[in-house]
Amino acid sequence: PCVERNGMIFGYLGPGDPPPLPAIDSLVAPDSHVFAFKGFLECNYLQAVEVGIDPAHASFLHRYLQDEDTDDAYGRQFRGGTGDEDVPVTWIMRNFPAPTIDVQRTDFGLQIEARRHLSESRDHVRVTNLIFPNAIVIPMSKSMAITQWHVPVDDHNCYWYAHFTSYDAPVDTPRMREQRMELYRLPDYKPRVGRFNQWGYDPSEQEDETYTGMGMDINVHDQWAVESPGAI
């Protein structure tokens, strides 16, 4: 009843024969093009799903007050460029904070489109897919997407399990892992920041670098948003 696919093990706990895994990109791509990782959150799984599918919060929670060279954005969400003109996503999110949101029901869950009208000739469109009951597929860059499952530990804690899927070159696995190990520790994959150190909050950073003052990794921003209310 268990299947290993691109660094993850999926188990079927229902009656009868297990159904086939869905043919989503991260499960059919070659393992050379997929990087797997996970992280612990002190919130219930539904809170983690909600923060992942919300298409508007990025303009505030993940707002960077300065734009960086988009060539240095590999492996980091909301940091690259978009479109043929390579406009920094940080600039778009900062200057167009109120997207038009359209939600469509699908046979797998929901498709959520966030459209930011940049000019008379340009729109920025970001599409998020929610695969019921607990998976999301979100764009990470022009050539990479994240497929992420949110799995309960108990009523107040969960793990996220993510596939980072590249649509062009093979994934730079050592680089992706090094980036994420800056925030997480082994063997339990718990974050190095949290309520115990105010999620790394730095008021001086908040003045001129980030909206939250909690570092450059968006996982910390989301972690603060779902953990700070306390157990729900």
Predicted region positions:
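C-terminal catalytic domain of Rieske-type non-heme iron oxygenases
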Residues: 10, 15-232
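Short, Gly/Pro- and small/polar-rich lid/capping loops
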Residues: 4
